[in-house]
From Swiss-Prot:
Protein location: Cellular thylakoid membrane
Biological-process GO terms, alphabetical: photosynthesis
TM stretches of this protein: 10-32
Superkingdom: Bacteria
Coiled coil: none
Name of protein: Photosystem I reaction center subunit XII
Topology in membrane: Single-pass membrane protein
This protein's GO CC annotations: photosystem I; plasma membrane-derived thylakoid membrane
Phylogenetic lineage: Bacteria, Bacillati, Cyanobacteriota, Cyanophyceae, Synechococcales
Keyword tags: Membrane, Photosynthesis, Photosystem I, Thylakoid, Transmembrane, Transmembrane helix
InterPro entries in the record: PSI_PsaM, PSI_PsaM_sf
Name of the encoding gene: psaM
Primary location class: membrane
Length: 34
């Protein structure tokens, strides 16, 4: 990948990844406790 990412794009990507990780963690916890 030779595309230059701007700081805004990197920030958005990190936020989206963080939300996805939190949702996956909460889902796994709810399934584990069920």
């Amino acid at each position: 990948m030779a595309t230059a990412l701007t700081s805004a794009e990197v920030f958005v990507a990190l936020v989206v990844a963080a939300h996805a990780a939190v949702l996956a963690l909460r889902l796994s916890i709810s399934l584990y406790e069920a």
